[in-house]
Amino acid sequence: MYLTILFLFVSSILLSLMFLLRKHLSHFSYQNLPPGKTGFPLIGESLSFLSEGRQGRPEKFVTDRVRRFISSSTGVFKTHLFGYPTAVMTGASGNKFLFTNENKLVVSWWPDSVKKIFPYTQSTYTDESKKLRILLMQFMKPEALRKYIGVMDEVAQRHFETLWTNQKQLIVYPLSKKLTFSVACRLFLSMDDPERVSKLEDRFNSVVTGIYSVPIDLPGTRFNRSIKASRLLRKEVCAIIGQRREELKAGRASAEQDVLSHMLMSVGETKDEDLANYLIGILIGGHDTAAIATTFIINYLAEYPHVYQRVLQEQKEILKEKKEEERLKWEDIEKMKYSWNVACEVMRLVPPLTGNFREAIDHFTFKGFYIPKGWKLYWSATATHMNPDYFPEPERFEPNRFEGSGPKPYSYIPFGGGPRMCPGREFARLEILVIIHNLVNRFKWEKVFPNENKIVVDPLPKPGNGLPIRIFPHF
């Protein structure tokens, strides 16, 4: 009896493994697929993909396989990521193909871990999603954002006065996140209470850590903690939405005061849960990009004093023309040419969005290789930005790369591209420049550990030690 049970158990395990192996291999049975390797059944090469990021070198997963499987630096190779066969498109030509074929041959796609952390109804990613995105893009247009520069300036000044002044040493990354999250809450939700903002930020941080984790929902795992935090966060954002609906009905809030009011007055009967999912997404994107860029700008300005001096000189000239207590304006931002070149070079070396996925909605060929319908596609900003064909001596920090006409089209993609390009890129530009202005006019700084440059991508890039610095006020 015991041997029979053991035999049945072992047989079921073997049959399951054979099924998984057969299913895994069936994805790659087409003719003329891109070169590459598929890794292990089910997990594919996901662990290698995640590991390279957590070691601060996300481009290595791509560049190693480009050298091994592709004759040039632009092309396509196959792999298997997050449970799906995946084609990785490389170089400016790959980026252009994906970005210009959005909603024709490819659509946006997220791994299952993201979908479980951010559950959505069918309408969230179809008609309502498109409508919400259009509304957000209207809010994020440069002409619409101009009136918010003074608010950004006010929030930045208060942040540096309360959390940096009188400090001798601090850790940059968490403070950068706190600042940019405060700006996002103020402009998107009209939320200005520091205690309430801090509580919401803690929820967001707990959610983000599990986005690209292994999707095993067991107690104690990062994925499980992220799912729990996501539920609590969604509940809080739904409460904010419900409160705003009442304020709009009672005339205590206006349709023009922030993104939330603008959406509520424009989308009709959209469910609060769907609105909450969308708001959570734009709040993550609305502060993480600027927080990451600001952190690494501070890092590189500490490493290159001559660049810091040139940025300081540019910002001093702007400050000199301002009256006391006068806020920054659009005309001031337009004068920050070199400061923006510095920010662009920082985002080349450390792109806030290291890459992203698409899904093939039809069969197509690229560079002579067949890509089946249903395959996932990945583009890499880090690999493109470190390609010497586009950026000579790519590891060298050189802001002057962005003088004149700048890089080749589709070779510089910190905000993605095509219809799915980050709608908040102009918002991020204004916020980054406002922060630089307030920062360099107040402080000089140095790194506590000058030779420590470890970067961890999990899922977004950040300094391994948070970037501790010593600060020295100008006055």
From Swiss-Prot:
Top EC class for this record: oxidoreductase
SUPFAM superfamilies, sorted: Cytochrome P450
InterPro entries in UniProt: Cyt_P450 (IPR001128), Cyt_P450_CS (IPR017972), Cyt_P450_E_grp-I (IPR002401), Cyt_P450_sf (IPR036396)
Keywords annotated in UniProt: Heme, Iron, Membrane, Metal-binding, Monooxygenase, Oxidoreductase, Transmembrane, Transmembrane helix
GO molecular function (one): oxidoreductase activity, acting on paired donors, with incorporation or reduction of molecular oxygen, reduced flavin or flavoprotein as one donor, and incorporation of one atom of oxygen
Subcellular location: Membrane
CC annotations in GO: membrane
A Pfam family hit: p450
CDD domains per UniProt: CYP90-like (cd11043)
Highest taxon in the source lineage: Eukaryota
Gene3D superfamilies for the chain: Cytochrome P450 (1.10.630.10)
Record field: catalytic activity: beta-amyrin + 3 reduced [NADPH--hemoprotein reductase] + 3 O2 = oleanolate + 3 oxidized [NADPH--hemoprotein reductase] + 4 H2O + 4 H(+)
EC numbers: 1.14.14.126
UniProt entry tagged with the keyword Iron: yes
Classification via PANTHER family: CYTOCHROME P450 26, CYTOCHROME P450 716A1-RELATED
Stated family: Belongs to the cytochrome P450 family.
Name of the protein this chain belongs to: Beta-amyrin 28-monooxygenase
